Each structure stands twice: as structure tokens, then as C-alpha cells.
């Protein structure tokens, strides 16, 4: 879960936990919280349609990059971070206005077919100097989705199940999960 869905303190505590048990921490869709990154053992950067924290320096410093195509709790939907959760630090990381709703698109405009996804995987691999590139999908039409993802030749695929959580789902979805 992203910084915004979870507090700064929670994100840092989870990162410290990953260091203690030597596992990976994912940024979530909200960009890179520097203190979380510094305290994690391995750090997976979630590459999302809004392109939060995307620059060559960040792509080179993370352990891996995960392209978010889908998320279990909100398959086919974008995100919504309510204005009251958009602090000064969150606004800065996301490049958004303080105390305004942050709406995340449901998909990448530049990915319309398998070749577009393959091109993005290749581009991110090059820009990150060879970091592993993954693709995150929601568990929906699994065989079709896996075929699409595999065609891009990622290093890993994350299948996100419905039972997961997010602070950015529409209220009707959160209430039903």
C-alpha cells in the first residue's frame, strides 16, 4: 500500500520489518517515500500511470520495478486519495496540490497492445540499468492476462488477489471487500 493509504510511520515500520527478515518492500502506487526506501532491505518501485517518482535516478536506485496493470481490490479501476489525506509531503512526492483529491487513472494511455507493453518493459530495463522489471495484474481473466504479460518478457509477474487491500479504492468497493 502506498504512502497516503498508509501513514509515513506505518510505511517506515514495514520497511524496517523487511530489513529484519530480509524480504522486499513495495512502494505502492504513491511514489517513493525516501525514509521507507532507506529502511528497506529490497525495494520494489511500483510504476503507475501517474508516473509518481519516475526519473532515471530513482529507477536506478531501486531493487526492481513493477508495472501496475491491475490491482486485486480495484480491478480495472483507478485510484482516489481523498483531499484530507493529501499532506504537504504526499503532494510533493506525487506532484499534486495540497489538500486536493488525487485521482489516478485506471490504465496507461501508452499501452494499447502487447507490443506497447513489451516496449515499456524494455525501456524501463534500459533506464534502470538492468533492474528486474515485473508486471502486476489483478486475478481476473488469468490465462488471457498472463499471456498478455508474458509476451512483454518481464522478469517476474505479480498476481494480486481480491483479498488484498487499498486505501485508494472507491468507497463502494472498500465497503464490499
Feature names for model-found ranges:
Residues 1-105, 116:
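N-terminal capping/small domains of soluble enzymes
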Residues 105-177:
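Glycine-rich phosphate/ribose-binding loops and adjacent secondary-structure elements
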Amino acid at each position: 500500500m502506498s504512502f497516503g493509504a498508509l501513514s509515513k510511520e506505518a510505511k517506515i515500520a514495514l520497511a524496517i520489518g523487511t530489513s529484519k527478515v530480509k524480504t522486499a518492500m513495495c512502494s505502492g502506487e504513491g511514489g517513493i517515500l525516501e525514509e521507507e526506501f532507506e529502511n528497506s532491505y529490497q525495494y520494489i518501485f511500483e510504476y503507475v500511470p501517474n508516473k509518481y517518482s519516475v526519473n532515471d535516478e530513482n529507477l536506478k536506485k531501486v531493487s526492481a520495478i513493477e508495472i501496475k496493470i491491475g490491482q486485486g481490490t480495484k480491478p480495472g479501476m483507478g485510484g482516489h486519495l481523498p483531499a484530507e489525506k493529501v499532506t504537504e509531503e504526499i503532494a510533493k512526492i506525487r506532484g499534486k496540490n495540497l489538500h486536493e483529491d488525487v485521482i489516478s487513472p485506471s490504465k496507461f494511455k501508452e499501452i494499447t497492445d502487447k507490443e506497447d507493453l513489451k516496449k515499456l518493459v524494455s525501456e524501463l530495463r534500459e533506464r534502470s540499468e538492468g533492474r528486474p522489471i515485473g508486471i502486476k495484474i489483478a486475478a481476473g481473466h488469468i490465462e488471457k492476462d498472463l499471456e498478455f504479460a508474458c509476451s512483454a518478457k518481464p522478469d517476474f509477474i505479480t498476481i494480486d488477489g481480491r483479498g488484498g487491500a487499498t486505501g485508494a479504492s472507491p468507497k463502494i468497493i472498500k465497503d464490499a471487500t
